[in-house]
Amino acid sequence: MSPSDDPISSIFFERQQAALCAQHALNMLLQDSLFTYENLRDLARQMDQMEHDILGNNANAVGRSENMNDSGFFSIQVIEKALETFDLKLINMENPAMAEFKANPLTARAYVLNLREHWFVLRKFGNQWFELNSVKNGPKLLTDTYVKEYLHQFAAENYSIFVVQGILPNSEADDFITLCPVVPKPTDFDKKEPNLVQKFFNSVGRRLGGSQEIPDSQEDRDLAIAMALSMESKESSESSGSDEDQLAKAIEMSLSQDPNIPSTSAAPSELTETPILGPSTSSETPSGRIPSAEQQRRDRAKFLEKLEEEKKSQNVPEE
């Protein structure tokens, strides 16, 4: 493979056949076509026999397997047995011994995941993470931020997440992507991404007086997209409150979660009520629209001033 080729094409990938996701997940994890259905079937039968010998009459009836089914699904025990040949182990992420990886998922080299009898893999090549899922069209590049969010979401949705322990066999993809990282390709979502990023940073810049430029860092872009989507969700789901109030809440949440977003020393309540004024002393924004929070503050001030004047006029002694 030459450097002119797309680096992602160096990743070994298998498309789904029947329910052989365990076979595909193993081969994609190891980056070679090492296991067949027959291999895993034989392992499953060996394990069934061992269980029968140990449990005796308490074992399942002969012919019924707990380690495979007719569609091609294989249990975690079969996958673990297959990986023993390569001195690799799978340990559930909820195991206390895996606390390091739960706190910082990026320190692992790969994960094997299962939900409702479907197996797939998250694996690192070079310094980049990829989802290897046999029901997809090919490897999917993931940013570090997305890997963390994926695993967090998977855990919330009751996926079984296993940390791959041991040294994975080196592959062509490891070497190639280390030298030539994969460049993300535009997708339908990417067409919307610039608008989402610009929306968030325009909002932050306008409200906080900071820069409205789109950041170069992919991590910052990912965070901006997430916050913009959050803002869109709030706008569509909440019928009460103005758009400006919802935007202020989203910005306040983002500031409390990420210290890298430009901020001021003002308290959150000040950020939502204090307008960002330019050189002009006009009380209106360039668009001629007064922010609702500021309008409310000014209305209160005018009311209090009027009330104070009325009190003073009532206290003036008659001549």
Curated annotation (Swiss-Prot):
Claim: DNA-binding is one of the keywords in the record: no
Biased composition (Basic and acidic residues): 295-313
GO biological process assignments: chemical synaptic transmission; negative regulation of TORC1 signaling; positive regulation of ERAD pathway; proteasome-mediated ubiquitin-dependent protein catabolic process; protein deubiquitination; protein quality control for misfolded or incompletely synthesized proteins
Protein name: Ataxin-3 homolog
Enzyme nomenclature, EC number: 3.4.19.12
Molecular-function GO terms, alphabetical: cysteine-type deubiquitinase activity
The encoding gene: atx-3
Source lineage: Eukaryota, Metazoa, Ecdysozoa, Nematoda, Chromadorea
Organism: Caenorhabditis briggsae
Location of region: Interaction with cdc-48.1 and cdc-48.2: 297-300
